[in-house]
Amino acid sequence: MRHRLLIVDDEEHIRVAMRTFFSHRGYLVDSASEREEAEALLVNFAYSCVIADLRLSAGHGADGLEILGFVKERCPDTRIILLTAYSSPAVETEARRRGVDLFIHKPKPLAEVGRLVESLIRQGAES
């Protein structure tokens, strides 16, 4: 079975790079640039993992946390990774409280992100 990923980031070059990277590794990959678009995809497709930026646009610092809540409510088996270049201990604590599976600080090499995604999906399949 091919795993399906959802990449949510407001920066197009990041979405394209991640989509290309994971597609070449055999994943089915969808992407969204904003929370509403991501939620529409989540209603229509089953994802093994969602990789979302914490801050999707200026002034919407909680978008990643809102996506996290939406996924955990509607798709509890889907793994969630939040990416951020901007964080604080309080935000990370709140993300963990809401059920994030992994918090990754940018920048992180794609190869390392790929290993983390693969490991997280494998853990989910074993539980």
Go through the PLM ranges and name each one.
Residues A90, K108-E118:
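C-terminal output helix
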Residues V50, I80, F103-I104:
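Two-component signal transduction core modules
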Residues A62-E66, Y86-I104:
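Alpha4 helix (beta4-alpha4-beta5 surface) of REC/receiver domains from two-component response regulators
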Residues S31-C49, S57, E73:
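Acidic, metal-coordinating helix/loop segments flanking the phosphotransfer/catalytic sites
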Residues A40, A62-D77:
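Short amphipathic alpha-helix used as the core "switch/output" element in two-component signaling
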Residues R115-S127:
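The C-terminal output helix
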